[in-house]
Amino acid sequence: MESFSSKSLALQAEKKLLSKMAGRSVAHLFIDETSSEVLDELYRVSKEYTHSRPQAQRVIKDLIKVAVKVAVLHRSGCFGSSELALATRFREKLRQGAMTALSFGEVDFTFEAAVLADLLTECRDVLLELVERHLTPKSHSRIRHVFDHFSDPGLLTALYGPEFTQHLGKICDGLRKLLDEGKL
């Protein structure tokens, strides 16, 4: 007997449509103004660090696509109880990473690239486990691309170095606001 689900088909179409339109207009449906400002700063950091505009655009576009798809899955009630526990764990790890990044930015001589890299790697692994049966291998590779890019010790060291002080300040301001508002 053939299994058909209009809900599943609609969700699949929604994910496909959103993957084709990962621009600002769609992102604003799922990503607030403060998050958008943080993403813009992460783009600038990536562009300056890699000296490649296309590479920086690709990593932020991948990040937005993943965030939108996970939001669609969550809002559509696609996650079971064990997956909701993983989603909670992911959010806690992401929050811990944000608080650690803030602490490193506010307290001189405390930065350790390995600590942030490990937290981002843990976030990646939990997120991959969360979406394992919901997203395609292409989306899984996007997740790896984003987290591997931002957990690069060289990039993290540059971000906390003197040349990126202004970017780091804006990122920390955004993270602080997201934490204060309970959005992270």
UniProtKB/Swiss-Prot annotation:
Gene3D superfamilies: Tumor necrosis factor alpha-induced protein 8-like (1.20.1440.160)
Phosphoserine, modified sites: 3
Post-translational modification, as annotated: Phosphorylated by TAK1/MAP3K7; this phosphorylation triggers association with BTRC and subsequent ubiquitination and degradation.
One annotated Gene Ontology cellular component of this protein: nucleus
Main location as per UniProt: cytoplasm
Keywords, ordered alphabetically: Cytoplasm, Immunity, Innate immunity, Lysosome, Nucleus, Phosphoprotein, Ubl conjugation
GO biological process: innate immune response; negative regulation of inflammatory response; negative regulation of T cell activation; regulation of apoptotic process; T cell activation
Compartments where located: Cytoplasm; Nucleus; Lysosome
InterPro entries, per the entry: TNFAIP8-like, TNFAIP8_sf
Entry function: Acts as a negative regulator of innate and adaptive immunity by maintaining immune homeostasis. Plays a regulatory role in the Toll-like signaling pathway by determining the strength of LPS-induced signaling and gene expression. Inhibits TCR-mediated T-cell activation and negatively regulate T-cell function to prevent hyperresponsiveness. Also inhibits autolysosome formation via negatively modulating MTOR activation by interacting with RAC1 and promoting the disassociation of the RAC1-MTOR complex.
Domain notes: The central region was initially thought to constitute a DED (death effector) domain. However, 3D-structure data reveal a previously uncharacterized fold that is different from the predicted fold of a DED (death effector) domain. It consists of a large, hydrophobic central cavity that is poised for cofactor binding.
Subunit structure and binding partners: May interact with CASP8; however, such result is unclear since could not reproduce the interaction with CASP8. Interacts with RAC1.
Family (UniProt): Belongs to the TNFAIP8 family. TNFAIP8L2 subfamily.
Protein name: Tumor necrosis factor alpha-induced protein 8-like protein 2
